[in-house]
Regions:
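ABC ATPase "signature
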Residues: 176-177
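Conserved catalytic motifs of ABC-family nucleotide-binding domains
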Residues: 112
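Helical segment within the ABC ATPase nucleotide-binding domain
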Residues: 131-143
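Catalytic Walker B motif of ABC-type/P-loop ATPase nucleotide-binding domains
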Residues: 116-119
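Short, small-residue-biased leader/transition segments that mark boundaries at the very start
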Residues: 1-4
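Conserved ABC ATPase "signature" region
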Residues: 60, 64-87
C-alpha cells in the first residue's frame, strides 16, 4: 500500500511507481527529475542533519547542493527571517528541539522552492512551535506563490494550510476536494471528524457512497 510518505518519495524520484506515471512541474519523474530538483525541497522532522556541523555549515552544504546563488546572503536572510542568528555557529547536536525545527525549515527554504514537500512538519512539536511553523509556511506560500504538498495526520493543520485535501486509506484515495466541500459532503464541521469517519469505515449522511 502507498502511504503519503511514499507519495512524496515518488514525487522526488526516490521511489518508482508500480503503475502509472508521475509528472511534477512539467517534468516526467524520474526521467527528468534533475531538471526540476532545484525547484523543489523537502522537510521532515524524521530526517536530521549532521550533528557535528554548525547550522551555518549545514545550510551552506545544502545551499551548494541546490546551486543557490549569493548563498551567504541567502543564509543571512534566513537567519533573520527564522530567528537563527543566536545559534547560527552552534553545532546541530547542541540545539534544542525548537531550534532544530527552525533550522530544518531554513534548509527547506534555502533554494526558495516552487514546490515544498512537507512530511508531518509539526510532529512532536509543542503547540507554540507548531503554530510558529504554520505561520511561516503560510507567509512563504503567499510571498513566493509556492505550492505546498503537506502529508499530515493533523487535520487542524490541514484545514489551515491546504486549499485541496486528498484523504488516503490503505494506499487508496478516499476523497479529493477542498476542505469545505469534503466537510459538507460528509455532513461534518471539521476535517478531524471526516478523518475519523473514514478511518473507522463510517459513511455519514451526504457522504459519497463510492470514494472517488
Amino acid at each position: 500500500d502507498v502511504c503519503s510518505s511514499d507519495l512524496i518519495a515518488m514525487i522526488m524520484g526516490l521511489v518508482l511507481p508500480t503503475s502509472g506515471s508521475v509528472s511534477v512541474l512539467g517534468a516526467k519523474i524520474p526521467e527528468q527529475r534533475y531538471d526540476v530538483l532545484g525547484r523543489m525541497n523537502f522537510e521532515s522532522p524524521y530526517v536530521d542533519m549532521p550533528m557535528r556541523l554548525t547550522v551555518r555549515q549545514n545550510l551552506t552544504i545544502f545551499g551548494r547542493l541546490y546551486a543557490v546563488e549569493q548563498l551567504r546572503e541567502r543564509i543571512d536572510q534566513l537567519a533573520v527571517d527564522l530567528d537563527l542568528k543566536e545559534f547560527l555557529d552552534r553545532s546541530n547536536g547542541k540545539l534544542s528541539a525548537g531550534q532544530k525545527t527552525r533550522v530544518a525549515l531554513a534548509k527547506a527554504l534555502i533554494n526558495e522552492p516552487d514546490l515544498l514537500l512537507l512530511d508531518e512538519p509539526t510532529a512532536s512539536l509543542d503547540p507554540d512551535t507548531a503554530d510558529w511553523v504554520r505561520q511561516h509556511l503560510e507567509t512563504y506560500r503567499k510571498t513566493h506563490n509556492a505550492t505546498i504538498l503537506l502529508a499530515s495526520h493533523n487535520m487542524l493543520e490541514v484545514e489551515r494550510l491546504c486549499d485541496r485535501v486528498i484523504i488516503m486509506k490503505r494506499g487508496k484515495i478516499q476523497d479529493d476536494d477542498s476542505p469545505e466541500r469534503i466537510m459538507a459532503r460528509y455532513n461534518r464541521d471539521t476535517l478531524e471528524e471526516v478523518f475519523l469517519d473514514v478511518a473507522r469505515g463510517r459513511v455519514r449522511e451526504g457522504a459519497p457512497e463510492d470514494a472517488p
